[in-house]
């Protein structure tokens, strides 16, 4: 076979419906060597050059052949790759770009810090609600997700996890220091204020905390609102809303400085997760009812039913409800549900269907994540 006939078929693992690409190996690079002399790292470079739009960097892909992940320092001969063989390209998880903290409106932040500082020192129930939220790992993780730049600020993370430090840094007198040095911490503290204000009563109806518009307490970073978290404030009855409040679009906390032309930006998945994680009253019982006890009234939505009963909306409860809903609708077996992904894994040389099913189940059917789990030896 002449050198011009040396070619490989390349297929993206996460795009099973995309036709294979034919990669012809350059004759000038072969010299005295055959196709088998190519290293896997050099093959990655050729593939990145061939599929520039899909594979911009050879360091961000793995190659799969006959169910094996190819090592960069090995050759094609080592893996028995022949002309015409199909090599699957598995794109690694893209590195997340560094998130910059959202800008802070110092005037608005000062007003909100005063509200929080007053509430912390005048209401034991409010103070306990704040510290209960911050001591809950799940809630803290979701606050981190909802606050750009917070995860890369170790000082801010330390403050949120220490009651004494939080009380000190929530002082309005600290704002001049925090805004330039730790803007993400300012945004996180404002987030805590609005989260807890929706689920715990603020001290004193005549205090400065009541002088602010009620809608500002329900606003959350990310454009969603913490409405319906308290039995006292919102019962999902439109007639309890005044005309101005119902006709005026809500805005985000002014301290976060977001001003999109079309109003608040759409809710993202991470923000929705934050809302669900924090949508529980601090004083509510830890008892989680079964989905069968939810929503006895046909005129009441599941969310409002859970809210009015004061029951925390936890991830476990949400998962249980989803599972029961799937079972009620006749959820197909895992094998039939993920048959396309199973066949794709078989095409890549992974013949252990049981292993593949476990990996797919653990990753929710994500073929790329399942492959990474299988090759990492982490399939359950």
Swiss-Prot record:
InterPro entries recorded: UBA, UBA-like_sf, Ubiquilin, Ubiquitin-like_dom, Ubiquitin-like_domsf, UBL7_UBA, UBL7_Ubl
Matching PROSITE patterns: UBA, UBIQUITIN_2
UniProt-listed GO biological process terms: antiviral innate immune response; ubiquitin-dependent protein catabolic process
CDD domains found in the cross-reference section: UBA_UBL7, Ubl_UBL7
Keyword Flavoprotein: no
Keyword Phosphoprotein: yes
SMART domains from the UniProt entry: UBA (SM00165), UBQ (SM00213)
Posttranslational modification: Deubiquitinated by OTUD4 which stabilizes UBL7 expression.
Sample GO molecular function, one term: polyubiquitin modification-dependent protein binding
Segments forming domain UBA: 333-377
Comp. bias intervals (Low complexity): 206-221, 240-253, 270-293
Regulation: induction: By type I interferon. Down-regulated by phorbol myristate acetate (PMA) in bone marrow stroma cells.
Name listed for the protein in its UniProt record: Ubiquitin-like protein 7
């Amino acid at each position: 076979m002449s050198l011009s006939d040396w070619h490989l078929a390349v297929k993206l693992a996460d795009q099973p419906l995309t036709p294979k690409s034919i990669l012809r190996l350059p004759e000038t690079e072969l010299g005295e060597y055959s196709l088998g002399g190519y290293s896997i790292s050099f093959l990655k470079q050729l593939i990145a050059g061939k599929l520039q739009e899909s594979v911009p960097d050879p360091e961000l892909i793995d190659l799969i052949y006959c169910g094996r992940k190819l090592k960069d320092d090995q050759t094609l001969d080592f893996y028995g790759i022949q002309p015409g063989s199909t090599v699957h390209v598995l794109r690694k998880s893209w590195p997340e770009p560094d998130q910059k903290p959202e800008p802070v409106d110092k005037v608005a932040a000062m007003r909100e810090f005063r509200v929080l500082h007053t509430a912390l020192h005048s209401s034991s129930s409010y103070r306990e609600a704040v510290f209960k939220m911050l001591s809950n790992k799940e809630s803290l993780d979701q606050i981190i997700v909802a606050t750009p730049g917070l995860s890369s600020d170790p000082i801010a993370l330390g403050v949120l996890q220490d009651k004494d430090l939080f009380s000190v840094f929530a002082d309005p007198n600290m704002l001049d220091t925090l805004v330039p040095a730790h803007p993400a911490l300012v945004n996180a503290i404002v987030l805590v204020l609005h989260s807890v204000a929706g689920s715990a009563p603020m001290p004193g109806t005549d205090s400065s905390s009541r002088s602010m518009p009620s809608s500002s307490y329900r606003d959350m970073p990310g454009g969603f609102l913490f409405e319906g978290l308290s039995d006292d404030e919102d019962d999902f009855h439109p007639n309890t809303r005044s005309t101005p409040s119902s006709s005026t679009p809500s805005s985000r906390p002014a301290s976060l400085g977001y001003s999109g032309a079309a109003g608040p930006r759409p809710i993202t998945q991470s923000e929705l997760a934050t809302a669900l994680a924090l949508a529980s009253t601090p004083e509510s019982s830890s008892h989680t009812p079964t989905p069968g006890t939810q929503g006895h009234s046909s005129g009441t939505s599941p969310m409002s039913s859970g809210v009015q009963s004061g029951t925390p909306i936890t991830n476990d409860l949400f998962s249980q409800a989803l599972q029961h809903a799937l079972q009620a609708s006749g959820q197909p077996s895992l094998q039939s549900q993920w048959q396309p992904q199973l066949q794709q894994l078989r095409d890549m040389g992974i013949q252990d269907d049981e292993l593949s099913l476990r990996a797919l189940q653990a990753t929710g059917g994500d073929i790329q994540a399942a492959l990474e789990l299988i090759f990492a030896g982490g399939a359950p």
